[in-house]
Amino acid sequence: MSVSVERFGQGPDLVLLHGWGMNGAVWHGIAQQLAAHYRLHLVDLPGFGNSPLREGSDYSLPWLAEQIAIVLPQKCHLLGWSLGGLVASQLALTQPERLHSLITVASSPCFMARDEWPGIAPKVLTGFNQMLAGDFRQTIERFLAIQAMGSEHARDDIRQLRHWLAERPAPQFAALEAGLGLLADVDLRDELLQLSLPWLRVYGRLDSLVPKASIALLDERYPASHSVVLEKASHAPFISHPQQFVEIVRYFVG
């Protein structure tokens, strides 16, 4: 298993993990601004972009975190968007000594709605699984639309996401299927109570995948962490509000 990483820039090491269905090129819209201050590491998660997934791989969250740990600098700031936020959180729990800080973007320790927990409705994830079996490209298009839903610039956001996605090889079906499984099954709410690293959580108020009702619950659950909500952003705030997003990251990382 070989994890592909695009590296450039100078300064403290900042590793960026993309979300479901995407690849590391999704950060290209803000990469040059960040690279003026940080040594960037844009990772393609296994099965996405230029990181081929071997048949029979155990696509669990601990396994994903282990694969990413292999290509991490000795110590870094780690930023994960959406599903990438789950991977980053797992890494922060299992190898905290490798990280200076954790940043999760439009991510939740528990994506699927459960008793007294707002999240993605189970029927939505079931629907994506069914669509995936029939036409995975159409499924990704649908997911792009949901990610931009609510944004003032939804069409532009989708166009940007589609552009970056097309820069690298299409994702593998096995990774897409397993990734949906992680979004449905993973629940790190209790584990993250023990996290002692500096932790920034960034959200879009209009995000339909990480509903605003969950943000207050997370603020209450993790009082030592910091949260920033972009009022007019949806699930991809670094696409819709790039300048503001870069400023938030720079303020936190330093």
Swiss-Prot record:
Q: What is its EC number?
A: 3.1.1.85
Q: Report if keyword Methyltransferase is assigned.
A: no
Gene Ontology CC terms, in alphabetical order: cytoplasm
Q: Name one GO biological process term.
A: biotin biosynthetic process
Task: Kindly list the positions annotated as binding substrate.
Answer: W20, S82, L83, F143, L144, A145, I146, Q147, H235
Keyword entries, A-Z: Biotin biosynthesis, Cytoplasm, Hydrolase, Serine esterase
Classification via InterPro entries: AB_hydrolase_1 (IPR000073), AB_hydrolase_fold (IPR029058), BioH (IPR010076), Carboxylesterase_BioH (IPR050228)
Which Pfam families does the UniProt entry name for this protein? Abhydrolase_1
**According to its UniProt record, where is this protein mainly located?**
cytoplasm
Q: What class of enzyme is it?
A: hydrolase
Record: active site: S82 (nucleophile), D207, H235
The pathway this protein participates in, as annotated, is:
Cofactor biosynthesis; biotin biosynthesis
Which reactions fall under this protein's catalytic activity? 6-carboxyhexanoyl-[ACP] methyl ester + H2O = 6-carboxyhexanoyl-[ACP] + methanol + H(+)
Domain (AB hydrolase-1) ranges: 14-242
* A molecular-function term among this protein's GO annotations: pimelyl-[acyl-carrier protein] methyl ester esterase activity
Superkingdom of the source species: Bacteria
Protein location: Cytoplasm
Quaternary state and interactors: Monomer.
Q: Which family does it belong to?
A: Belongs to the AB hydrolase superfamily. Carboxylesterase BioH family.
Role noted for this protein: The physiological role of BioH is to remove the methyl group introduced by BioC when the pimeloyl moiety is complete. It allows to synthesize pimeloyl-ACP via the fatty acid synthetic pathway through the hydrolysis of the ester bonds of pimeloyl-ACP esters.
Record's protein name: Pimeloyl-[acyl-carrier protein] methyl ester esterase
Q: Which organism is it from?
A: Aeromonas salmonicida (strain A449)
| Source taxonomy | Bacteria, Pseudomonadati, Pseudomonadota, Gammaproteobacteria, Aeromonadales
- Gene that produces this protein: bioH
